[in-house]
Design a protein with these regions (language model features):
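N- or domain-start disorder-to-order transition segments that initiate the globular core
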Residues: 2-25
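Glycine-rich, proline-tolerant flexible connector loops at the mouths of alpha/beta enzymes
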Residues: 35-50
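Active-site glycine- and acidic-residue-rich loops that bind
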Residues: 126-140, 162-169, 197-202
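Glycine-enriched alpha-helix->loop->beta-strand junction motifs that scaffold or abut catalytic
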Residues: 30-32, 90-96, 145-150
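Hydrophobic faces of well-ordered beta-strands that scaffold small-molecule active sites
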Residues: 11-14, 34-36, 69-71, 98-100, ...
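Conserved small/polar residues in nucleotide/adenosyl-binding loops
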Residues: 209-216
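Active-site beta->alpha loop and helix N-cap motifs at the rims of alpha/beta catalytic domains
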Residues: 51-111, 134
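Conserved, mostly hydrophobic/aromatic
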Residues: 26, 37, 98, 141, ...
Length: 217
């Protein structure tokens, strides 16, 4: 297994791309990762504005207060995701990492990697496994790019795809398969956002996962 720099990914906060004013609060929270959101929670009519506001944050030296900074783009299989990638390629100050949602094949990751390499962007990748096709191909996806730092398990969308309840037992196989693929590729693995804030002890009960993700800041 190759030696890697150890990066703490114990806690994770989403910050909406339309609200750059919330970014200082997020980075000052002490979290390990701040993810600026362009996908879920951003209405189609607001996608362009959210993209513009988010990428403008990286036009100057951005102080993340020690937090890892990630931008979750839209799926590269739709027009919004393609526009996100195009904007990242066009800027001379790309985000340090992007999160790829709803990945179905390793070719999607390879394509993004190749485009970033052509522009000599050093942007890292985080990949969400939340589709049945992605689950089937997860072992190949995990090894599709040296830019990948972590796999995320998207349990809510996965439950919808598998037509099962979003609960521990029905998703145990899917969650375990993602964990195994990540371990085999020497990647971190991060669980579905934890939503039951009244049961914090439940957040500890995670199977082979580096960390669960909390909700928005």
């Amino acid at each position: 297994m190759a030696d890697k720099n150890i990066v703490s990914r114990r806690s994770f906060i989403f910050c909406p791309g339309l609200r750059p004013d919330m970014f200082p609060k997020a980075v000052n929270s002490g979290t390990d990762i701040v993810c600026i959101e362009l996908e879920d929670g951003i209405a189609p009519k607001d996608k362009d504005e959210a993209r513009k506001l988010t990428l403008s944050l990286f036009n100057t030296v951005l102080d993340g207060k020690g937090a890892e900074l990630i931008v979750r783009i839209n799926s590269v299989r739709d027009e919004f995701g393609l526009a996100d990638i195009r904007a990242i390629l066009e800027t001379s100050s790309p985000p340090p990492a992007i999160m790829l949602p709803k990945v179905k094949t390793p070719d999607e990751v390879k394509w993004v990697d190749e485009l970033l390499s052509e522009r000599e962007h050093k942007t890292r990748l985080h990949v969400i496994i939340e589709t049945n096709a992605g689950l089937e191909a997860v072992y190949d996806i995990a090894k599709s790019s040296n830019r990948i730092d972590a796999l995320f398990f998207g349990g809510v969308d996965m439950a919808a795809e598998l037509r099962c309840k979003n609960a521990w037992e029905p998703l145990l196989y899917a969650r375990s398969r993602v964990a195994h693929a990540a371990a085999g590729a020497d990647l971190d693995v991060i669980d579905v956002p934890y939503l039951d804030l009244e049961d914090l002890s439940g957040m500890i009960r995670c199977l082979l996962y580096t960390s669960p993700s909390p909700r928005d800041s």
